[in-house]
Amino acid sequence: MTETLPTPVLDTAQARVLGCLIEKEATTPDAYPLTVNAAQVAANQKTAREPVLTLQTGKVHHALRQLETLGLVRQQFSSRAERYEHRLGSALDLTRQQVAVIGLLLLRGPQTLGELFARSERLARFNDSDDVRHHLERLIQRGLAVQLPRASGQREDRYAHLLSGELDLDALQAAAARAAPSARSGADSSELEARVLSLETTVAELQDALSALQARLDAAGA
């Protein structure tokens, strides 16, 4: 798959599973590539996921096989268990930073530059938010991401991936408007966001440790 080929259109399960493979490659390298069970655990995490999903094992397995057909995932053959790794970077000729940005957008939906920069720490190195913007602009040029119009009450631009096709902008703006803080000052909002991101990182690290343990248990029981 090269730049001249059309962008794959992923369904909800495929997008979530692909995002999980991107995330876990960086955060739990000892447990990567992922087994089907580990991919399911990652897909159904209650933290660092928007929306929270409950995907059954069969659905996750089917999504992995479909992603494999699209050339975005490759199965690693093992005598103990099926394992899968993503090939997004090579399939679409993306840098590590661009893969990280796409992964975050797949897992957490539309986000601001600040959110992407803060949440990318464990996935890829960015110098600052402007560096994130640079890679986003490249993705936008490729038709893989888009800058969203600001909804009422929003102070910053948000970005979304286009691997699942065209977006329902009206629905996204309505959801963003409902979520926008109405009475909190800008300073208070920034401080709260920083605290939330710190807590999310801590919880995500704990979740990664559990995923690694699950992968070892899968291997031992296979």
Curated annotation (Swiss-Prot):
It comes from Xanthomonas campestris pv. campestris (strain ATCC 33913 / DSM 3586 / NCPPB 528 / LMG 568 / P 25). This is UPF0502 protein XCC4136. Disulfide bonds: none annotated. It holds the Pfam family DUF480. Belongs to the UPF0502 family. Gene3D superfamilies: Winged helix-like DNA-binding domain superfamily/Winged helix DNA-binding domain. HAMAP family: UPF0502. It comes from the Bacteria.
